[in-house]
C-alpha cells in the first residue's frame, strides 16, 4: 500500500513510531465493530499509532490492512511483519494525547 508521504516525513514518523507500542490488535475475530471503534478512537486521539495484525497469512493481513486504511482514511507509514504504523492527522489534536504533538513539540 503506497501512502502520500514524502520520504523525509516518513522517516520522521518512523522515528516517532519506533517508541510506540501497538494500541490496537486485530486477532482471530477479525474486524469486529469493537476493533473498528477502538481503531477510530486511537487514530482520533493519537494520530500516529501502531496496529498489530495477529491473523492469518500475509495475504490475509494485506487485505485487512488495505480495508482498514480505506475505512479509516489513514495512511500507511510503515509495515514490518504483522505490525503497521498508521497516520491520520486530526484537525484539532489534543496535545496531551497526540503522539505527533507530544514527540515533535
Explain the meaning of each model-derived region.
Residues 1-105:
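Positively charged, polar, low-complexity stretches
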Amino acid at each position: 500500500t503506497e501512502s502520500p508521504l514524502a520520504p523525509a516525513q516518513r522517516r520522521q514518523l518512523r522515528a516517532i513510531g519506533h517508541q510506540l507500542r501497538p494500541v490496537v490488535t486485530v486477532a482471530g475475530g477479525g474486524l469486529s465493530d469493537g476493533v473498528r471503534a477502538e481503531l477510530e478512537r486511537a487514530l482520533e486521539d493519537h494520530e500516529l499509532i501502531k496496529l498489530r495484525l495477529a491473523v492469518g497469512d500475509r495475504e490475509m493481513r494485506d487485505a485487512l490492512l488495505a480495508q482498514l486504511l480505506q475505512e479509516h482514511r489513514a495512511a500507511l507509514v510503515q509495515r514490518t511483519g504483522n505490525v503497521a504504523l498508521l497516520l491520520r492527522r486530526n484537525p484539532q489534536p489534543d496535545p496531551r494525547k497526540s503522539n505527533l504533538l507530544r514527540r515533535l513539540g
